Amino acid sequence: LFALNLGFYPVLWVLSIARVLRHRDRVRADFGHYGRAVGFFTTVAATCVLGSQCVVIGESVTAAIALWIAGIVLWAGLVYAVFALLTIKAEKPPLAEGINGGWLISVVAAQSVAVLGAQLAPHFGDHAPHALVFALAMWLGGGMLYLWIISLIFYRYTFFPMSPSDLAPPYWINMGAAAIS
């Protein structure tokens, strides 16, 4: 799988950039959509998972560090872009329509940055404690985000009517977010 990921990762970036260049309006609409905006956090998780594979399987610390830095930059940019945009929107959907398990991808993104940072820390020599503190901060921040989001999802499950179609694939992310946390 590692070899496949090394091939698929750049292809996904090329396709993502092509989508931005060819369909700017759709990408902009996705950033402002409560169901799709959080999906952009998958780029952070993918970047850091590949970085983890580089450390564990590929034994390429340099590539892993580059991917970790890219993951941090992507995470920081997306946190401000996605959450700020959704927060300041004038028109907002009701909670039952606006929240789903896909929101937990933001947690998975933060936790993946933390995991890769912890894996890389031993390679930083005297700076290892700094990397570990940063990884801990990311993990704790992701944990807080998990508590906030899962509380809203639980509230939605418990107090709003649900149909089988409401249990679409994004709801299954609930378990993945708990696992990485």
Residue ranges and their predicted role:
Residues 1-5, 25-52, 68-71, 87-118, ...:
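Juxtamembrane helix-loop boundaries in multi-pass membrane proteins
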Residues 1-17:
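N-terminal signal-anchor module of multipass membrane proteins
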Residues 59-70, 74:
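Transmembrane helix-loop-helix
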Residues 79-88, 116-117, 144-158:
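Juxtamembrane interface elements at the cytosolic ends of transmembrane helices
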Residues 17-26, 52-63, 85-88:
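Transmembrane alpha-helix boundary signature
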Residues 1, 54-63, 117-133:
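Helix-coil boundary and interhelical linker segments in multi-pass alpha-helical membrane proteins
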Residues 10-15, 150-156, 177-181:
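C-terminal transmembrane-bundle signature of multipass membrane proteins
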